[in-house]
């Protein structure tokens, strides 16, 4: 996908770049497949901030996605490839032979007019959904289920791809985009191929306003806060943090503290932890 670079007409356009939308269709989303959504602004049901740096942004319509891919043995044609403001990948409108229409994540390389199908006897080609038991080793996949029938939960971001590396008994070994290696039931469905829009990481927003359009607010450093707000806060003028090592706003050690529950039931299925950032 082409990346458009801006000239430095203003400070906001200097180094700014956007992705080209040549493969997208500029149409309104299907009304039956959309619904309104409340912007939570990072608050929980009591109004307390649980996810910082969120709020504002443009109003959005939610596109109901088909993560289950449970239209078994019913071929569908890709009618359009559309922009979705709720995720960083594009979406496809699939028109099935029985007349039903659904939105799915856009697999890389899929074009308008291509045919896809779900089922255990589907061919190993991009966009088709099959159980892991029917896929050969080394297959690149996305939208992978963790629990059979629950719908895809792994490898759903733009450019994400997982890899099937082993099968033994009723379990398959999968390498996820984060580097984690884990066991998953071979009855789980997955879609063949990589998610599209892989060049999203090369996009340069250029100015703070572009982030605000997406509902992302500024990240304030703890060292410029008051002591009541952050462990790094306080002091006269530009002061050091006054601690042996950096801390989170809640007093935990920053940069490397494990956030996963120690006694989580699914720990036995994880063969190798994900990479640290």
Swiss-Prot record:
What subcellular compartments does it reside in? Plastid, Chloroplast
Coarse class of the primary localization is: plastid
Record InterPro entries: NA-bd_OB-fold, Rib_uL2_dom2, Ribosomal_uL2, Ribosomal_uL2_bac/org-type, Ribosomal_uL2_C, Ribosomal_uL2_CS, Ribosomal_uL2_dom3, Ribosomal_uL2_RNA-bd_dom
Keyword Kinase in annotation:
no
Question: To which protein family does this belong?
Answer: Belongs to the universal ribosomal protein uL2 family.
Q: How does it assemble?
A: Part of the 50S ribosomal subunit.
Q: Which NCBIfam families match?
A: rplB_bact
Q: What is this protein called?
A: Large ribosomal subunit protein uL2c
This protein's encoding gene: rpl2
């Amino acid at each position: 996908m082409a990346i458009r670079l801006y000239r430095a007409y203003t400070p906001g356009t200097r180094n700014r770049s956007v992705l080209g939308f040549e493969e997208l269709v500029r149409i309104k989303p299907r009304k039956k497949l959309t619904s309104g959504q409340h912007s939570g602004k990072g608050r929980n049901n009591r109004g307390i901030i649980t996810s910082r740096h969120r709020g504002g942004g443009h109003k959005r319509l939610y596109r109901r996605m088909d993560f289950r891919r449970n239209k078994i043995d019913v071929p569908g044609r890709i009618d359009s490839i559309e922009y979705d403001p709720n995720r960083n990948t594009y979406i496809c409108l699939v028109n099935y032979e029985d007349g039903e229409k659904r939105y799915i994540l856009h697999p890389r390389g899929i074009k308008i007019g291509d045919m896809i199908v779900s089922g255990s006897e589907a061919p190993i080609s991009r966009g088709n959904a099959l159980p892991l038991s029917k896929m050969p080793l080394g297959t690149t996949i996305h939208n992978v289920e963790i629990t059979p029938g629950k719908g895809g939960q792994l490898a759903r971001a733009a450019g994400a791809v997982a890899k099937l590396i082993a099968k033994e008994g009723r379990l398959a070994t999968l390498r996820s985009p984060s580097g984690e290696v884990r066991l998953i039931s071979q009855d789980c469905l997955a879609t063949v191929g990589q998610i599209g829009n892989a060049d999203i990481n090369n996009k340069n927003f250029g100015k703070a306003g572009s982030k605000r359009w997406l509902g992302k607010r500024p990240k304030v450093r703890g060292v410029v806060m008051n002591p009541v707000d952050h462990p790094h806060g306080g002091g006269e003028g530009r002061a050091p943090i006054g601690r042996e090592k950096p801390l989170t706003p809640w007093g935990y050690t920053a940069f490397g503290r494990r956030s996963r529950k120690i006694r989580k039931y699914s720990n036995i299925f994880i063969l190798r932890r994900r990479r640290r950032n």
